[in-house]
Amino acid sequence: MKAVSIYPVSESALTICLGNELNAVVNDRVFRLYNHLRKQVNPFWKDLIPAYCTLTVVYDIKEMRKHSQSAFKWVSKQLKEAIDQCDDAGILPSRQLSIPVCYESEFGFDLKSLSKAKKLSIDQVIKLHTAQTYRVFMLGFLPGFPYMGIVNDKIATPRLSSPRKLVPAGSVGIAGNQTGIYPLDSPGGWNIIGRTPLQIFNPRVSVLTDTSLLQPGDEVKFYSITKEEFHSFDQENFNPLSA
């Protein structure tokens, strides 16, 4: 297991690096620590920002200096102890979700060009995309935007050289070896290959409920639906955990 490195990013924040590879093992370490720190009733932590392999901790510099002249050293010591506890906690439980996607040309703006670039038929691209189970590594870019991987090398492709001014909510795209879903209408540079009718972000839900359907650590599998199924989709009665 890679040694932990901790480095300051400002007077009142530091980043913990738990690995340098995009994989579930490292990502699990990040979110075990993230969940552990979130559960603590600790006035020192002002914000926790998880990513693929890192966790950035923003802390109350005034409170920290009551304990030590070097806030960075004091916080680092506390976090190293927390990491040791978390590394003994085992694998994080994950949810399995099934998400419908319509890969018709009116939704998959870049499906034809991607298939041509990869010397594959459109059906082959769809089969490769739906064959894989993807891990949600993190949320970012937009509220509830899931960064998922890892995409089959045969359909992995760089971002568009010129981003679109508008990508509709629900659009499913590929960028590099990752796939993602746009939760809102937004500009974007991912290669759009389809669209899900499922609303994955709802800012108007109860404060006791996650506004984002997908959470880090979830496992996602896509399945293909027709245009008719897309337009008749029943959001209210659909459960992605049992689809």
Description of each model-found segment:
Residues M1-D88, P93-A243:
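Glycine-rich active-site loops that engage anionic ligands at enzyme catalytic sites
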